[in-house]
Amino acid sequence: MAINLATKYSDKIAEAFSHASYVRGKVSNEYDLSGVKSIKIYTPVTVDENDYQRSGVNRYGTPQEMQDTVQELTMTQDKAFSLTIDKGNNKDQMNVKGAGRMMQLQLREKTTPAADKYALRRFATLAGKVMTVSAKPTKSNIVSTIFDMGQIMDDAQVPEDNRYMYMTAEMYKLVNISDEFISLDKLGEKSISRGECGEVDNFRIIKVPTGYLPANCFMLATYKGSVLMPYKIQDAKIHQDPPGLSGNLLEGRHYYDCLGKYFKGCGIVCIGNEYLFHYSS
């Protein structure tokens, strides 16, 4: 891409709209991958109770060895970038490309969105329950659909706290103009942190840009304890006048991955049409 040299223009750069991560902070940090490339997560499997016998042997029942399910996570996302800011070009552009500021711009516009998109798409493919619908939710049924997703988690005894519902602005608009909205708390009054837009049925609503959720996925619900996004490397470096360059060299590397942890199969619930790609891991 060409570098446009400024002549009489403002020293401001029109930075594209960007956003902090929608996902990080809403995932579990229970596991540490320091020193390893893969981890195995063991989930114990409990047994049903039986009637106590007041005579005979094994009055509590026949002892059974506790079983478990095993999930393995292998780190696959090893991403990097490299940018140069030539000192001469920057001088001709009124020094508008400050290295630190350009690094932040790169992270906000490229690195963070790429990781968020990967995470949400990964979580959707690992959903324990997929609600298949023939058409997008409408203002007349979107709130009841959210409650249906909550019921799935309730029936699976997923804890009610730390539940999140990711949806596009299109779906969020439908919630706001829905018939049931008048009986709900005003979503805007419950905003807690960047990206959160209130609550419906114990779900903290996270409004994400179009393209973050996988194609044909209308909403994605997660329980924090069921989704992992471990990072092993988060490097962002600025080299001033490195060999072979008069100017700054910006480099970054991010090594991470995502996993949906079993929580009775329903710590992740998504709704989409029949074309939504899904598999159970």
Predicted regions and their residues:
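Sequence/fold signature of self-assembling virion shell proteins
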Residues: 2-50, 69-77, 82, 94, ...
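Alpha-helical scaffold segments that mediate packing/assembly in large oligomeric complexes
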Residues: 89-156, 268-281
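Short Gly/aromatic-enriched secondary-structure transition segments
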Residues: 54-62
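Structured, hydrophobic secondary-structure cores that serve as assembly/anchoring elements
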Residues: 46, 61-63, 69-70, 75-96, ...
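Phosphate-binding glycine-rich loops and adjacent basic patches that engage nucleotide phosphates
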Residues: 1-4, 63-73, 104-114
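Extended, solvent-exposed, turn-rich assembly/linker loops in the middle of proteins
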Residues: 127-195
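Solvent-exposed loop and beta-edge segments used for protein-protein assembly and interaction
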Residues: 33, 99, 157-159, 244
